């Protein structure tokens, strides 16, 4: 198997994990020529003058965002591959990844609500019509939940973000004018008649996970809401998300006493070049009632420029920003470290934090050598 996480590479170059003993800091180093490939070492901190000609001066009077964490997505594929490992090897890998004393101290992970495009099959937790038929499915029960429990045993305070790739198909219509049923995993829109049921679906999912001992820190209403083409997907423009959050999801979480955060959007900096969707979360914030239920917005970097993060923060500094997906693969020559290491370091590891993101989460923590 190939143990793969972009963030593992990104934090390796002169970056520190949460692991710290006495005055030593654990550092993982990767160089773009692979002379050092994820080499772990201990660096002693002291008050001696550094040999480096560069000096970093900290001004304690200037404050930026506090960090909630760094991590990766724990998808169905990730969990399936982890469960295929020998238990002792899996434990060693998870400790190396999530322990803040024996490893890197990953502190934030993302999981799908129902299937993602890296699941074993397409499904939701309510494929039989009627929200009373909600139930966790085999992927959660056999793979995702057992792995999450192992992670929580290593890192009890880890934060978990949930995102759906699609609503149940019986809630879909082909468009909001004709409202014709749309029985496809790909594309479609959420029928407004099912806003309340879908909000209940979120509540039931959060409660079901918590019943398994898995606390959910936050959710997004829809992964990549402007992407109609994913294997499991749902189009949800900003006006739809505004109405869904304001009239259903936000109130439903509040009335059930759940403190789960809601982050809007969860898609690209350039809003997939759709003119009418530009400034997506900011348009939702302009509605005071909808904004009251939103902690902030989430972004991916598959299109556009990270300067959009500064734009959003400048206009709505009271709303948080988190970064929830980036990936490498054949399509972007992602394994070519000589070409990509510093570019990815600048774009994802530094470009997000330096532009107000409180969390940085990359895509699949682990895949096999067939990229699945």
Q: Where is each model-derived feature located?
A:
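Short acidic/His/Gly/Ser-rich catalytic and metal-binding motifs that mark active-site loops
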Residues: 118-122, 168-182, 226-230, 271-275, ...
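Bacterial Sec-dependent N-terminal signal peptides
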Residues: 1-22
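Active-site neighborhood of glycoside hydrolase catalytic domains
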Residues: 197-218, 225-331
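Structural recognition of the beta-strand scaffold that forms the well-ordered cores
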Residues: 68-76, 107-112, 117, 159-163, ...
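Signal-peptide-cleavage-adjacent N-terminal segments of secreted and extracellular proteins
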Residues: 23-43
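Aromatic/acidic polysaccharide-binding cleft in carbohydrate-active enzymes
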Residues: 320-372
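Extracellular/periplasmic catalytic domains that process cell-envelope and extracellular macromolecules
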Residues: 63-67, 102-104, 153-155, 255-257, ...
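N-terminal catalytic cores of secreted or lumenal carbohydrate-active enzymes
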Residues: 36-216, 237, 247
């Amino acid at each position: 198997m190939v143990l793969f996480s972009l963030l593992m590479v990104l934090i390796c170059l002169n970056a520190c994990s949460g692991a710290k003993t006495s005055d030593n800091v654990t550092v993982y180093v990767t160089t773009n020529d692979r002379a050092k490939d994820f080499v772990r070492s201990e660096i002693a901190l002291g008050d001696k003058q550094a040999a480096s000609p560069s000096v970093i001066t900290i001004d304690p009077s200037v404050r930026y965002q506090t960090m909630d964490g760094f991590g990766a997505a724990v998808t169905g594929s990730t969990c399936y591959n982890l469960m295929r490992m020998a238990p002792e090897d899996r434990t060693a890998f998870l400790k190396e990844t999530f322990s803040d004393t024996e490893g890197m101290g990953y502190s934030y992970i993302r999981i799908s609500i129902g299937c993602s495009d890296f699941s074993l099959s397409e499904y939701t937790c309510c494929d039989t019509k009627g929200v009373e038929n909600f139930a966790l499915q085999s992927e959660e029960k056999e793979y995702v939940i057992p792995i999450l429990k192992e992670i929580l045993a290593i890192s009890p305070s880890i934060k978990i973000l949930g995102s759906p790739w699609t609503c149940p198909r019986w809630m879909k219509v082909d468009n909001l004018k004709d409202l014709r049923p749309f029985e496809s995993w790909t594309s479609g829109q959420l029928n407004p008649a099912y806003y309340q049921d879908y909000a209940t679906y979120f509540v039931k999912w959060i409660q079901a996970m918590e019943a398994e001992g898995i606390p959910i820190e936050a959710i997004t209403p829809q992964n990549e809401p402007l992407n109609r083409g994913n294997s499991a997907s749902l189009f949800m423009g900003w006006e739809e998300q505004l109405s869904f959050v304001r009239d259903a999801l936000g109130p439903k979480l509040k009335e059930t006493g759940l403190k789960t955060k809601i982050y809007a959007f969860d898609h690209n900096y350039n809003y997939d070049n759709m003119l009418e969707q530009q400034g997506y979360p900011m348009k939702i914030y302009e509605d005071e009632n909808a904004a009251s239920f939103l902690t902030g917005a989430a972004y991916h970097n598959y299109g556009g420029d990270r300067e959009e993060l500064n734009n959003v923060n400048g206009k709505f500094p009271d709303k948080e920003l988190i970064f929830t997906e980036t990936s490498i693969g054949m399509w972007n020559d992602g394994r070519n470290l000589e070409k990509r290491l510093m570019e990815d370091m600048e774009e994802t590891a530094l470009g997000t934090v330096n532009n107000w993101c409180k969390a940085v989460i990359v895509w699949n923590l682990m895949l096999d050598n067939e990229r699945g």
